[in-house]
Swiss-Prot record:
SMART domains: C1Q. Residues 82-212 form the C1q domain. GO terms for cellular component: collagen trimer; extracellular region. Residues 40-53 have a biased composition (Low complexity). The keyword Translocase does not apply. It comes from Bos taurus. Keywords: Collagen, Glycoprotein, Secreted, Signal. The lineage of its organism: Eukaryota, Metazoa, Chordata, Craniata, Vertebrata. Glycans are attached at residue 125. Residues 40-76 form the Collagen-like domain. This is Protein HP-25 homolog 1. It is found in: Secreted.
Length: 212
């Protein structure tokens, strides 16, 4: 019968397929056993290979945290500065000036701590070489004056003033560079008779600006 033949054919094909799968599995097991029998024992470790080439530089990492504050350093050496040289004076006169061409001798010493001004002669003697400032201030009433600022007998500057029935002022100053032993003074340029008229008050002073 045709239907019976189809079922027999299908059963034959299925049986063949199962038989083929069994054969393949058997062959695989045999091959695996043969490979296992061919492998020998593990050999010794070989020498290390050559180093590989260096890789490219990596990316820059983030900035690290600030470090701890270091210990304070040792204190520095303390040195004493030498004292600066000093030289100054201030003197005052109330009354007539002496005759001409001689130093004016002042009656009152306002300042002369270094002793560089000689009150007896009216002369400043330079003991500290350097740059000095000298000046004078004169107040007049019914009188006339003419004075010269002198250095070693040479006039540096002069000043003339007259006053009637009112008070007048006359002043002058100069900056001089002196060497040790130089002498500075203020002297009158009028005769004594002219100087004795009226009332005169004068202050003469000087001080060191910068020592050499």
């Amino acid at each position: 019968m045709p239907g019976g033949r189809r079922r027999v054919g299908s059963m034959n094909i299925a049986g063949f397929w199962i038989l083929a799968q069994f054969v393949l599995l058997l062959v695989a097991n045999v091959k695996s056993s043969a490979d296992s029998e061919l492998c020998g024992p593990r050999g010794a470790r070989g020498p290390p290979g050559l180093s590989g080439l260096p890789g490219p530089p990596g990316y820059t990492g983030p900035i690290g945290m600030p470090g701890l504050t270091g210990r304070p350093g040792l204190p520095g050496l303390v040195e004493k500065c030498p004292p600066l040289p000093q030289s100054a004076f201030s003197v005052k006169l109330s009354g007539p000036f002496p005759g001409p061409s001689q130093p004016i001798v002042f009656q009152e010493v306002l300042y002369n701590h270094q002793g560089h001004f000689d009150p007896a002669t009216g002369v400043f003697n330079c003991s500290v070489p350097g740059v000095y400032h000298f000046g004078f201030d004169i107040e007049l009433f019914q009188s006339a004056v003419k004075v010269g600022l002198m250095r070693n007998g040479i006039q540096i500057r002069d000043k003339r003033a007259e006053a009637g029935d009112s008070h007048e002022q006359a002043s002058g100053s100069s900056v001089l560079e002196l060497e040790k032993g130089d002498r500075v003074w203020l002297e009158s340029k009028l005769d004594r008779e002219e100087s004795e008229k009226g009332t005169t008050h004068a202050v003469f002073y000087g001080f060191l600006l910068n020592g050499n």
